[in-house]
UniProtKB/Swiss-Prot annotation:
The keyword Cell cycle applies. This is UDP-N-acetylmuramoyl-L-alanyl-D-glutamate--2,6-diaminopimelate ligase. Its EC number is 6.3.2.13. ATP binds at residues 116-122. Signal peptide: none annotated.
Amino acid sequence: MTDRNLRELLAPWVPNAPGRVLREMTLDSRTAAAGDLFVAVAGHQTDGRRYIPQAIAQGVAAVVAQAEGEAEEGEIRELHGVPVIYLHRLQERLSALAGRFYQQPLHALRLTGVTGTNGKTTTTHLLAQWAQLLGETSAVMGTVGNGVLGHIHPADNTTGSPIEVQQLLLQLQRQGATFAAMEVSSHGLVQHRVSILHFAAAVFTNLSRDHLDYHGDMAQYEAAKWRLFGELDVGQRIINADDATGRRWLQKLPQAIAVAVSGTLPPERQGDWLCAGEVRYHARGADIPFRSSWGEGIVHCQLIGEFNVSNLLLALTTLLALGYPLPALLDSASRLQSICGRMEVFHAEDRPTVLVDYAHTPDALEKALTAARLHCHGKLWCVFGCGGDRDKGKRPLMGAIAEQYADRVIITDDNPRGEAAQDIINDIKSGLLDAGRAQVISGRAEAVTSAIMQAAPADLVLVAGKGHEDYQIIGKQRLDYSDRTTVARLLGVMA
């Protein structure tokens, strides 16, 4: 297909489609313009077929709409002179349709997909960084944003629509990308957003309770994740053997690659494997010895926490499975950077190590403090607050967690919004066994400054809650503020 012609586009499904030249393809009637192809899908929240008249009024050249059943398959109608072609199970076919429209841009780059409840963002960024250190031009697609490294733009969804995915792949191809790491969400898998893609490798991080409002139960949630490994076009399959779901999947996929931080692999494995030895944690990161089907060695990294050891070893194994050489991977590992605002490490000579993290729930704060403790050789400090006009029940819980896991606690503001900052602080303090143990410094910049100035060089300071955010909401004002920038300025380093 050398141009975007409706007849050629629909040839696999509708042999008698009219020959209209198409400019662009869209699911959103609000952005439809003259010459576009409007795709009207019956979605989970709205039925795109309701907006066909609006799209036609805006000048679209043609419409492909979801048929009510097989009887309508291939039916062609006209509305105000615009052809409307009906396809059965359109949502399932949309990935293939978009792939034909954008001329299969994936053929020009190597794509890896990462799925799981936690760790998708970090693992995709590690894959992209590492591949780039070995000479690739790398891109990421996911929660933090999409684009070539160094030029990442914010994203609305973890996995975009099939059209957005193909548009992005074409854009990355034009920018010279040779390697891309994509977060693949359970929603994206159920909604067939990536069904036409070829993944050189697929990675499973872990599975825990999440998104049950959408999937209904854990069995359906697991089934959604399984689609990437059991139904789609995948080369290498890399699976976390420390996870209960991962161990079950390894039994179903004998040639899949098993990765274990625990040091214990499932018995009688047929496929390749990688297994960590005893990890040494220190203030600047971790040293991770390992054995594998490709050889053994020690990974020296700047990442914090046991969960990041797992993410890193999954990335390492994936790149080994794709043929990247072990010596080059080990030589470059120390240059891997933590993800912006995700257990991000800041350090300077003779100053405390500082972590900036997005943890803003009780569970996330507990995990962040537990991870930080592994790397702390002095006192562990925690600077945090809770958002205003949000879940008040978590405030005392987070206070109790900070008191339990940190040696020094400073309670501060975190987007107080329309609530009085002192009321939020009082709610947090109500969870403390000894309220006198916590300092209260309402201004967030002052609180971060105080912690860093008081802490000794062997101490570690966790600044939790905002992560990559660059604002503070007070009342109705959205003020410029960044924990990362504040910490970097105090330590005299780059953010």
